[in-house]
Amino acid sequence: MEQRDYYELLEVSRNASDAEIKKAYRRLAMKYHPDRNPGDTSAEEKFKEIQKAYNILSDKQKRAAYDQFGHAGVDPSMGGGPGGFGGFGGFGDVFEDIFENIFSGGRGHGRQSRGQRGADLQFNVQLTLEEAAIGKEVEITVPRHGTCTVCEGSGAKKGTSPKTCETCQGMGQVRIQQGFFSIQQTCPTCHGEGKIISDPCASCHGQGRVRESKKINVKIPAGVDNGDRVRLSGEGEAGVHGGGSGDLYVQISLKKHAIFERHENDLHCEVPISFATAALGGSIEVPTLEGRVTLKIPAETQTGKVFRLRSKGMKSVRGYGQGDLLCKVVVETPVNLSREQKELLNKLQDSLENAKGTHSPKTSSWFAGVKKFFEDMKF
């Protein structure tokens, strides 16, 4: 299957800057994201292609290889390109790892050390259930390595710039012919960076990044749950020597609620009702995240009965649908009764015992079971 040009996929020119590529990726990723196109397989495939294109073009060395060799330069299964051993497919990388470690003194791939990407970071945010229900924008302060503003991430002293390594011509790797094998190894001059910094920046000591604490506004969508994460692309650690920045993951946790328990998008709660309301029926007010609502209790309601209030739970974090509120009624036993109240209850009990059909089906079944048990045991 013919692969599309990565620049065409991101709708940018071949000389587009890193910032232009990143901007185009964000726009297209938002447009074709599966959450915005549920059930649309073509949009999902487009999203995957866009991600793959960005992964290549956002990496300086991969982009250089792609510009020079096309898809073969970044796809080991296609053969050719700077990785070599293309005819062996996956075996090429195995041989390359072995020989590269031998000839480079164990430093590993120059591709990995050159323009090293910054690490991903995680920041924990705790919300109340009410905040999670409607979403919230929070300001967080993240300690991290940020791009050095003095050298703008280059690592070179202001007014100067890194020079292209003459040994590897900026590729970070050189080839050595060993018999039948053409062996690729890390450039011994620039150690895989592709550039030489002769006069490093005093602020970042040539690293291109410095420690900082950055304030970031995070929009947390409605419906988030424990363990959900919000990804902020490029807000992690800045890369070394101009490498791409990592991502920031905001980890969500919810505080325990005094009334509701959450099960996915449904909310559960227990609602106490009086003995009289359970027997005779009535109406009670129950709380929801949107305010109070009236719940009708039918006569002869038993404790443990669950009433479902549709669409009174949590919104789906994907933006469609809403859970329910399940109210479990608990019949209260009256306490601190007066003498008169006790006498009335005794009279009620006597009248119930002498009347037939006043027990609930569950109670009648239980008494019948107990009676049969004693008969079988012949007590």
Swiss-Prot record:
Family: Belongs to the DnaJ family.
Protein name (record): Chaperone protein DnaJ
Binding-site positions, Zn(2+) 1: C148, C151, C201, C204
Entry annotated with the keyword Repeat: yes
The encoding gene: dnaJ
Keywords: Chaperone, Cytoplasm, DNA replication, Metal-binding, Repeat, Stress response, Zinc, Zinc-finger
Cofactor annotation: Zn(2+)
Originating organism: Legionella pneumophila subsp. pneumophila (strain Philadelphia 1 / ATCC 33152 / DSM 7513)
Pfam name, any one: DnaJ_C
Subunit organization: Homodimer.
Zinc fingers, CR-type class: 135-213
